[in-house]
Each structure stands twice: as C-alpha cells, then as structure tokens.
Amino acid sequence: WRWALNGGLTLSHGWKPETGFLRYRWEGYSEALILYVLGLGSPTHALSARSYDAWTSTYRWKKVYGHEFLYGGPLFMHQLSHIWIDFRGIQDAYMRRQSSDYFENSRRATYVQQQYAIRNPKGFRDYGAHVWGITASNGPGPATRRVRGVTRRFRAYLARGVPHGPDDGTLAPWAVAASLPFAPEIVLPTLEHCGHAYPHMENEYGLVCSFNPTFPVPGSKHGWLSKDHFA
C-alpha cells in the first residue's frame, strides 16, 4: 500500500506495466473509501493515519436542496463501499466534526438525487419524484439531437452526477435499487413506479442498466434503452 502512494500522501489512481503510475490520485470523496480502509488495515504495509487525513482533507461538504452532506455527484460513489462494510455509527475525525457518518451521508445523497429530479433544472423528459438515478452508466451518445426546440448533447458511458452534472437525461434503475438500504421510503415507490411506467425495461435478465426518455428513437415512445444488463 505504501508503494501505491507513489511518493505522495494520497493513493495513486493506479499503475500500468507499460506506463507506470497514472497521473491522477484518489482525492475527494468517492468509492475509494473502501480502498483507504483496506490500506489502513494491512498487517504488513499499512497506510498511515497521515495518508488517510490527507485524503479526507480533499473532501467537500456542501448544502444542496436543504441537505448537508459530503459531496459526490454520481450516486455510485455513495454506494459501493457499503457493499462490504456497514458504516452505521462508524465515524472518522471528519465525520465526527460533521456529526454524521457515511451511512447517513449516503441517505442524504439519495434524497439530493430525488430533489434534483423533482426540480429538473435542465428540463429532461420524465424526471420527477419517482424517476431518478443519475450515476456512472452507459448512454445513447455520442450524439447531438434537437429535442423540442433544444439542442442537446448526449454522451456514451460517463460518470453522470448531480447537481452540477454532467447530466444528459440518462438514468440508471440499478442505482435506485442500490440505494434501498439508505432510503427505502423513496426507493421502493420509485422502483414500483418504474415497473409500471417502463415495463419494457425489464426482461428475463432483470432491469437494463440505463435508459434515456429524452433521446429520440424512431418508432419508440420511450426513448433510448440500453441493451446491456448489470449482474
């Protein structure tokens, strides 16, 4: 783990045999939470507390739509580390200062997602209290289309996020489902609504990984639908 610091305090984004260390580092709150926990727990080459503090010093605490939380735009950032650790009641120095924990932070991030969809600042089709889920996902692009008098640029795979974007109207139902532990009171109604409003999204493999109602598709009243699934 100390090797992965590449001479710095925060972890390198990665290493390739052909080119060596990547130029970027794991800084700012993200799915790297589990990475730093693993590094701190190593019995032989552990990261130091100084390294962890250097990472948390890059955090951004924001108030969005009335919710104060540790900011991360894409929803997956608030979900992946929780697959392995139940963070309820676990606080580091940063979260103690905020009187919160990472589980509560993910709950607030889920509500921010819903509120963004309700406000729908960019005017995408279908966004609302029961249609949200903006995260890293496949998209219908790269393409530019004129939709209801507005020129819109659509992306392919991209880490989409709220409230600062990027956002091109692409939604991921799996991201909603993955928020079930944090906010079941808004997740379950959303999944139920999507099951009725978008029955074409589900097949024998489950839900498709993403869809975009705003992207015009000839012969379809539902817009773009990904052909991929997440297992």
Q: Where do the model's predicted regions map?
A:
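Ser/Thr/Asn(+Pro)-rich, low-complexity disordered segments
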Residues: W1-A231
